[in-house]
Amino acid sequence: MAVPKKRTSISKKRIRKNIWKKKGYWAALKAFSLGKSLSTRNSKSFFYPTNK
């Protein structure tokens, strides 16, 4: 049966947790930025219907 040999230090655990949190932060920031550009119609990668 596989068992870890030593306990992970608190500092290493904290570093890994912060990396994990930072990934979520950047994903949320990108989503917010995309939503903002869509709402202001400044996005260059989406086509908007023109009402004439």
UniProtKB/Swiss-Prot annotation:
The keyword Iron does not apply. Coiled coil: none annotated. It is found in: Plastid, Chloroplast. One of its GO terms (cellular component) is large ribosomal subunit. It holds the Pfam family Ribosomal_L32p. One of its GO terms (biological process) is translation. Belongs to the bacterial ribosomal protein bL32 family. This is Large ribosomal subunit protein bL32c.
